[in-house]
Design a protein with these regions (language model features):
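Conserved anchor residues at repeat-unit boundaries in beta-strand-based tandem repeats, strongest
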Residues: 2-13, 25-36, 48-63, 75-86, ...
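Beta-turn initiation residues at beta-strand->coil junctions
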Residues: 18-22, 41-44, 68-71, 91-93, ...
Length: 174
């Protein structure tokens, strides 16, 4: 473990670089020994290996706008509060799938849009990472389901109206 940087009253304060024994590294601002302000945290060996978080910290946790890049190719750009994804943000998977919308406590929650590389798209409400509330799922061939969702599933049975554009709507099941 090694720290190179500024100290004040025996604490890390100001600019500095801390390297941990597992190869992790934080480069940025410190206040009273905690990550505070602008900085880049690169994780070392282990579960979070090679993940990188860039931007703002408060009390040692990601806060404000930030970017985190995961070793599996996923990337999140957006708001953090107390170390969790909170507010507006975009998560892009390595396969090109993308979510743009609201986050709460690290989960997709609120209004958002999820798109797939094949052209499929869900637009609507999310809760705890799942479709929940009013939403529209559009398939790449133009078919649509418009209706209510609960825990990632359609809440009601479907009916479809066949026209040039097939539209399926939720209706009360029997």
């Amino acid at each position: 473990r090694k720290y190179v940087g500024e100290y004040k009253d025996g604490e890390r304060n100001g600019q500095g670089t801390f390297t941990s024994s597992d190869g992790g590294k934080y480069e940025g601002e410190y206040k009273d020994g905690e990550y505070q302000g602008q900085g880049t945290l690169t994780f070392g060996k282990g579960e979070w290996e090679d993940q990188k978080y860039v931007e703002e910290y408060k009390d040692g946790l990601p806060n404000g706008q930030g970017t985190i890049t995961y070793p599996n190719g996923r990337k999140y750009v957006g708001e953090y509060k107390d170390g969790e994804r909170n507010g507006q943000g975009t998560l892009t998977w390595s396969n090109g799938k993308k979510y743009v919308g609201e986050w709460k406590d690290g989960e997709m929650s609120g209004q958002g849009t999820k798109t797939w590389t094949n052209g499929d798209m869900y637009e609507g409400e999310f809760k705890d990472g799942k479709y929940d509330g009013q939403g529209t799922y559009t398939w790449s061939d133009g078919r649509k389901y418009v209706g209510e969702w609960k825990d990632g599933e359609t809440k009601r049975s479907w009916y479809c109206h066949f026209t040039l554009l097939e539209v399926c709507r939720g209706m009360e099941g029997e």
